[in-house]
């Protein structure tokens, strides 16, 4: 609210413009329903985790889904404590963890989100 209405909007209008595209929902189910209503079809649900699961997919796989435009995607970033197993099992896919040069791969959500969004929607520098 601060960035959309008060001093924050005046201080940083670019952030206010970006947040105009954000919609808040009270649950994952309501987010899926909102996307379904807007897009006319249910989204492919994808989440992130520092662990792998049987339905873990690569960045390349999700990037192809995103660029195909066949179905809407709902990408959910969890918390530092992760999500309940039942919730994890409800997603179509779990995106592979962000791996680095060592075994430790737990990042704050803001850092992980920035890296993941760049890998999914950023320039494909590795194809050049």
Where on the chain are the PLM-derived regions?
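RNA substrate-binding interface of SAM-dependent RNA methyltransferases
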Residues: 1-50, 114-126
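Flexible, charged surface loops at secondary-structure boundaries
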Residues: 36-42, 66-71, 89
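Structural motif
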Residues: 43-46, 72-75, 92-94
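Long, charge-patterned amphipathic alpha-helical coiled-coil/hairpin "stalk" segments used as oligomerization
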Residues: 49-86
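Structured adenosyl-cofactor binding patch, chiefly the S-adenosyl-L-methionine
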Residues: 81-128
């Amino acid at each position: 609210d601060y960035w959309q209405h008060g001093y924050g909007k005046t201080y940083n209008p670019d952030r206010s413009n970006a947040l105009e595209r954000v919609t808040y929902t009270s649950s994952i189910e309501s987010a899926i329903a909102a996307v379904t209503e807007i897009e006319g079809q249910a989204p492919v649900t994808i989440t992130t985790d520092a662990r792998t699961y049987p339905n873990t997919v690569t960045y390349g796989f999700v990037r192809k889904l995103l660029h195909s435009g066949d179905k809407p995607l709902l990408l959910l970033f969890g918390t530092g404590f992760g999500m309940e197993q039942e919730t994890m099992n409800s997603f179509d896919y779990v995106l592979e963890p962000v791996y680095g040069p060592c075994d430790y791969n737990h990042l704050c959500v803001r850092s992980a989100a920035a890296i993941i969004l760049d890998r999914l929607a950023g320039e494909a520098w590795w194809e050049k």
